[in-house]
Amino acid sequence: EADLAIAGKPETLPGAVAFSMLENLAVVLIAPALPCPVRNQVSVDKPDWSTVPFIMADQGPVRRRIELWFRRHKISNPQIYATVGGHEAMVSMVALGCGVALLPEVVLENSPEPVRNRVMILERSDEKTPFELGVCAQKKRLHEPLIDAFWKILPN
């Protein structure tokens, strides 16, 4: 059991969880930068997104973002290459040419340079609702001295 967690804020925050926002994060759609079939698919003027393979998060706010992206682009049956548990794995799979992925830009910025140099950003989020990164704690534990002291120094 963790005392605190740093996480993306879900659409619906459980009532027992306190959330203090740290930062709004940009979300980026990335593709392989090296020559490969996926790069060829996305390099045309109007890509047929329904045929492009996607690497997706298995759950969480990023998963919901890509589902919204699919709806906005009227893609009812996306080509899912893989569903993974970590954003870092998504960057590596894109760098290998497996597909494209939507993820927080900070993940890409903190990826190892050899991996980061093998991907390109296709688009940045222009959404009205930002991806909020923050600190979470159980409300019932906010009175504990260590958690209370930490919570008081947070920006919100």
Where are these regions (language model features)?
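Short, well-ordered beta-strand segments
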Residues: A5, I30, I55, A101, ...
